[in-house]
A protein has these predicted regions:
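Alpha/beta-hydrolase fold nucleophile elbow
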Residues: 97-109
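Glycine-rich nucleophile elbow surrounding the catalytic serine of serine-hydrolase chemistry
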Residues: 107-117
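The alpha/beta-hydrolase serine catalytic core
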Residues: 104, 113, 125-214, 218-222, ...
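The serine-hydrolase catalytic nucleophile loop
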Residues: 37-49, 206
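Conserved alpha/beta-hydrolase
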Residues: 45, 49-71
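N-terminal cap/lid segment of alpha/beta-hydrolase-fold proteins
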Residues: 1-25
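Short beta-strand element of the alpha/beta-hydrolase
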Residues: 26-35
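Catalytic nucleophile-loop/oxyanion-hole region of alpha/beta-hydrolase
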Residues: 67-97
Length: 258
């Protein structure tokens, strides 16, 4: 069963979508975080939520400000509002399903970037949790320039940049400055599975490999032929299988994935 609602907390209005297991109270909660220009109805989120529903798991997804069904405007999109949205959703999930014994995170691209920026506060709330990062935008400033189709910073300072897919966002240089001064390349001391396409047109593969080396508890699975959106036949099924196995294993055996 899927349920929609909007969380209101201070200056935040956060559309959420919950996927409930059909026959169980659910002992596991999965927080799903979409990418830049995407939304909570992502095909990856939907497929993994459906699969994990067979394994006693509640999934909760949400829209960042200025994304999807969010009533917030592009001028309200910032790293601060994105991180606070994620943390608010986590607080809501923990209060809604107090019986949960385990927490997991699925985060794609920009969503992975925001998750890593907020990792310390997430640990404070959920303890050690299992995390799957799909095509993480570790240096989001570089990804943003590719999405904006410009490397002319001077031009960006003069005007606003239109980004997005189904919903367009008009963003100023101030947002890019936030991205420039915040990158997620650090040792986060967390077990994590990184799913990365080797033909990704947005992510610098050298950044991903360096991040894997820096994070000794991480595991990188490189998907041959996959682009950033993993939209070739069979790739979605592969992601679902790998994520499910990672979430369900009692102990994270990295050697099985390397």
């Amino acid at each position: 069963m899927d349920q929609h609602t909007v969380l209101t907390y201070g200056d935040l209005q956060i559309p959420i979508l919950t996927h409930e297991p059909d026959y169980s109270s659910g002992s596991r909660v999965l927080i799903a975080v979409h990418g830049f220009g995407g939304n909570m109805h992502s095909s990856v989120i939907g497929a993994i939520a459906e699969e994990m529903g067979f394994y006693n798991t509640h999934t909760i997804a949400f829209d960042f400000p200025a994304h999807g069904e969010s009533p917030m405007h592009a001028r309200e999109l910032s790293l601060d509002t994105c991180q606070r949205s994620l943390l608010t959703v986590v607080d809501y999930a923990m209060a809604r399903w107090p019986q949960a014994k385990e927490y997991c995170v699925l985060a794609s691209s920009f969503g992975a970037y925001i998750t890593l920026l907020a990792i310390d506060e997430l640990k404070e709330r959920m303890g050690r949790f299992k995390m799957v990062l799909r095509c993480p935008a570790l240096r989001m400033n570089k990804v943003f320039l590719k999405l904006a189709r410009t490397d002319d910073v001077g031009l960006m300072k003069k005007g606003r940049i239109i980004c997005g897919y189904e919903r367009k966002m008009e963003l100023g240089y101030d947002f890019f400055e936030q991205l420039q001064t915040n990158n997620a390349v650090a040792d986060h001391d967390m077990p994590m599975l990184i799913l990365q396409g080797d033909q990704d047109e947005l992510i610098d593969l050298e950044d991903v490999e360096f991040f894997r080396i820096l994070n000794g508890k991480s595991c990188l699975v490189m998907i041959p032929g996959a682009s950033h959106r993993f939209n070739h036949e069979g790739e979605l099924d592969m992601i679902v299988d790998l994520a499910r196995d990672w979430y369900l294993c009692e102990e994270v055996l990295l050697c099985e994935y390397r």
